[in-house]
Amino acid sequence: NIYLEFEAGEDVTEHMNKAERRQLRQSFEAGVEVVLEPTKEQIVEWYGLLKRLYRRIHRPLPSVDVFLKLNELNIGRVFVVVYNDRVVSGSAILCKLGNSQLFYDWYRASVEDVIDGVYPSVVSTWQAMQLVSDMGGGIFDFMGAGLRNKEYGVRKFKLTFGGELTSEYRYRKYLIV
């Protein structure tokens, strides 16, 4: 896992590397918007991105109903990133469960096509981190970082936002014959 700690009201861009800060600025200049309270239709559209991703990587995915309820149950946040009236990214964050100061970067998906000057994954990652700061600070857990000795693009991307690799684990499937 990769942890990054934020104070309340902190500018989280200070933790990001120069390239990601530039991509964030370019995305907003191009007209990207973050919708912190998305409509049901926007969440369903984002879920379509998630579903395609999880089908491709062969991982289980909860029902869309889980994400539709997340904001109203007050245990997490779902937000989307919109560009030209199209949902291009989004995230589901679990917030301070129990007495914990941890925020979990639970699910994220972005469009796979390239849009000139727009970096949906950078925007949704930044917004997830900003929510931690806006909600009083705490520790942002990027979650999965793969195995250290194996090349893993997702880990490389997450580390550009700062943070510290704290642990590694990987589930393994064993067949019992």
Predicted regions and their residues:
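Active-site/acyl-donor-binding loops of N-acyltransferases
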Residues: N1-D11, M135-V177
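Conserved acetyl-CoA-binding loop-helix of GNAT-fold acetyltransferases
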Residues: I115-Q130
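Polar/charged side chains located within well-ordered beta-strands of beta-rich proteins
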Residues: S91, D105, T125-A128, K158
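A conserved beta-strand-loop-helix scaffold within acyl/acetyltransferase catalytic domains
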Residues: N1-G117, L147
